[in-house]
From Swiss-Prot:
Gene3D superfamilies linked to this entry: 2.30.30.790
Matching Pfam families: Ribosomal_L19
GO biological process, alphabetically ordered: translation
MF terms in GO: structural constituent of ribosome
SUPFAM superfamilies registered for this protein in UniProt: Translation proteins SH3-like domain
Protein name: Large ribosomal subunit protein bL19
Organism listed in the record: Psychrobacter cryohalolentis (strain ATCC BAA-1226 / DSM 17306 / VKM B-2378 / K5)
NCBIfam families per UniProt: rplS_bact
Gene from which the chain derives: rplS
Function statement: This protein is located at the 30S-50S ribosomal subunit interface and may play a role in the structure and function of the aminoacyl-tRNA binding site.
Family matches, as HAMAP family: Ribosomal_bL19 (MF_00402)
Keyword Ribonucleoprotein: yes
Entries under PROSITE patterns matching the protein: RIBOSOMAL_L19
GO cellular component: cytosolic large ribosomal subunit
């Protein structure tokens, strides 16, 4: 429950940007707008989401990747205008909300299992006792 003034809530809700849903353990590619002088380009930051904070306009998430053997973490504001897009590469199966323990791990011990897609429900065919005739007769004149 928020204790914010209703007018503040309206203004904050107007600034929310639609983003894909993701969770800690997911591997994401964040396209970040980078200014170099007068030029603006997109820079991809791909890594594992180790933390996510859901607070409306103040929502944030942290992405960790290994670059040249060195761990690099970057925190992003979810609704920030410098984020061009977020693409979820793979879903990770984890049992924690914060994956800070990955900071001490490297190599195979830092791997995260992939979440399997949910199974489709089995379709059971109903047995019918009525037999379907081989040839259906039509009334003359039709």
């Amino acid at each position: 429950m928020s204790n914010k003034h209703p007018l503040v809530q309206v203004i904050e809700n107007a600034q929310l940007i639609e983003r894909p849903s993701f969770a800690p353990g997911d591997t994401v590619v964040v396209q970040v707008k980078v200014r170099e002088g007068e030029r603006e380009r997109l820079q991809a930051f791909e890594g594992v989401v180790i933390a996510k904070r859901n607070r409306g306009l103040n929502s944030a998430f942290t992405v960790r990747k290994i670059s040249s053997g060195v761990g690099v973490e970057r925190a992003f504001q979810l609704h920030s205008p410098i984020i061009d897009s977020i693409e979820v590469k793979r879903r990770g199966a984890v049992r924690r909300a914060k994956l800070y323990y990955l900071r001490e791990r490297s190599g195979k011990s830092a791997r995260i299992r992939e979440k399997l897609a949910p199974r489709a429900p089995k379709v059971v065919k109903a047995k019918t006792d009525a037999r379907v005739p081989d040839a259906v007769e039509t009334a003359p004149g039709i």
